[in-house]
Amino acid sequence: MPTINQLICKGRSGLTRKKKVPALGKCNPQRRGVCTKVYTTTPRKPNSALRKVARVKISGYGEVTAYIPGEGHNLQEHSVVLIRGGRVKDLPGVRYHIIRGALDLRGVQNRKKARSKYGVKKSG
């Protein structure tokens, strides 16, 4: 137990919060990486599906697992992608999303609504 004098001189150190997206660093909203593996995985109970995910190697950090949103994709090994933060609630360990329509990942085909989220240009 510290004395009053020790508390006046030093004070108490605040708690440091754990980062939710450590791979993005302090001030990067997105980062570029290279896909090392593209595969499907199953979600936690009570959901049932085959979710598309990719292992992405980020220089200066390591490998992370990122979710591929939307229907269909053209990703394969060695594709260069842009990742952003944002977890997938029913996939344990998936804390990042891959941005559609940026770098090697195409936008979703035949998408009419919410196009900006899926990297689709306005047609016509």
From Swiss-Prot:
Membrane-spanning parts: none
A Pfam family of this chain: Ribosom_S12_S23
Keyword Ribonucleoprotein among record annotations: yes
Family label: Belongs to the universal ribosomal protein uS12 family.
Its biological purpose: With S4 and S5 plays an important role in translational accuracy.
PANTHER family: 30S RIBOSOMAL PROTEIN S12 FAMILY MEMBER
Protein name (Swiss-Prot/TrEMBL): Small ribosomal subunit protein uS12
